[in-house]
């Protein structure tokens, strides 16, 4: 597809009955304080100057092609697809939660699995935010499936959170209860790194008092624990203060931890998400042991020139493969071919 055609492509992202409010991402539309950040599935709308909807009729009224999100028991998505087909809207579907453990949990229910199968086969196609989810979709249909990593506005200086005089280690995960997140192991590893390098640690913990006590019992020399949520821009500012973002996640997720690191112009160490594997091939968890990742992290904490070089290479990769321009071209080409 010609770049001019990609520039004119608009996408309606539909999350039927979802919690997020209707939101437009026009070229000249500035972000609002209470609007959703242009990340995750909102990024598909943002990179095409499209919009996010929760009401099917509103998405249909745009006359744009639709990306229909599958969530919950898929009943609302099934009804929405029927309306979209009746209105002859070109519609592709995507699982809203695409970590390996999340897909397995969602589709373990027989009725939900049957509904998923029907939706995937009746839609014009499917988009996956991870290569593994794309392969899973292809088990149910032979064509019309695309791996489209979630784009990030790395080319937009309004989202450039580069910062001088960084210090410390930011722990990218926060879920103790999900085994594949390896959050406990990450904290233990970071405790060791902090002891050796004298770098402070920051972690978010929205769990119960028991989890806060567990962190306290680890005996960090200097740790900052955030127990309250903050808006995305404030969160990025917090991430950007640190030398590295560290995680041991093995969930095959889309990779927002690495995406946050890209906007912070920092380095993500560990994790096997899609963005981690694309943007941080030198430091991601793919085919690396936890011990190797700890070694990499320790080296980067004490070698500023290497850390800056890896961050710069990640930014260059992202501008080529993960930017809003790249995302818009991928989506426009995919929908045109359906």
Task: Give the residues covered by each predicted segment.
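N-terminal pre-catalytic "stem/leader" segment of glycosyltransferase-like enzymes
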Residues: 1-82, 87, 286, 329
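Conserved catalytic-core segment of nucleotide-activated headgroup transferases in glycan assembly
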Residues: 25-30, 155-157, 161-218, 224-232
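Short beta-strand->alpha-helix junction loop in the catalytic core
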Residues: 99, 132, 147-159
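A short, active-site helix/loop in glycosyltransferases that binds the activated sugar's phosphate group
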Residues: 110-144, 209-213
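Nucleotide-sugar-dependent
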Residues: 181, 246-258, 271-280
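Acidic donor-binding loop of glycosyltransferase active sites
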Residues: 237-253, 266
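A charged, aromatic-enriched C-terminal amphipathic alpha-helix characteristic of glycosyltransferases
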Residues: 301-336
């Amino acid at each position: 597809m010609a770049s001019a055609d990609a520039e004119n492509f608009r996408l309606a992202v539909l999350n039927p009955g979802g919690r997020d409010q209707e939101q437009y991402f026009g070229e000249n539309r500035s972000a609002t304080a209470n609007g959703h950040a242009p990340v995750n599935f909102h990024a598909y709308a943002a990179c095409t100057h499209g919009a996010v909807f929760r009401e099917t009729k509103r998405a249909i009224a745009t006359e744009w092609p639709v990306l229909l999100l599958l969530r919950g028991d898929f009943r609302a998505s099934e009804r929405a697809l029927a309306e979209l087909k009746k209105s002859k809207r070109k519609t592709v579907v995507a699982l809203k939660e695409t970590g390996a453990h999340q897909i397995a949990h969602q589709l373990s229910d027989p009725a939900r699995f049957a509904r998923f199968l029907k939706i995937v086969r009746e839609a014009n196609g499917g988009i996956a935010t991870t290569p593994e989810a794309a392969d899973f979709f292809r088990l149910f249909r032979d064509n019309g499936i695309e791996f489209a990593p979630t784009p990030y506005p790395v080319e937009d200086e309004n989202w450039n959170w580069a910062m001088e005089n960084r210090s410390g280690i930011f722990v990218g995960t926060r879920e103790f209860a999900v085994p594949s997140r390896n959050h406990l192991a990450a904290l233990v590893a970071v405790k060791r790194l902090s002891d050796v390098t004298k770098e402070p640690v920051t972690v978010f913990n929205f769990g119960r008092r028991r989890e806060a006590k567990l962190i306290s019992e680890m005996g960090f020399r200097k740790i900052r624990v955030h127990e309250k949520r903050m808006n995305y821009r404030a969160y990025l500012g917090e991430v950007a203060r640190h030398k590295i973002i560290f995680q041991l996640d093995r969930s095959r997720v889309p990779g927002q931890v690495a995406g946050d690191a890209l906007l912070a112009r920092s380095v993500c160490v560990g994790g096997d998400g899609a963005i981690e594997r694309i943007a941080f091939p030198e430091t991601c968890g793919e085919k690396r042991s936890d011990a190797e990742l700890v070694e990499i992290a320790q080296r980067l904490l004490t070698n500023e020139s290497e850390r800056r070089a890896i961050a710069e290479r990640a930014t260059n990769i992202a501008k080529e493969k993960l930017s809003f321009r790249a995302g818009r071209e991928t989506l426009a080409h995919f929908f045109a071919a359906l």
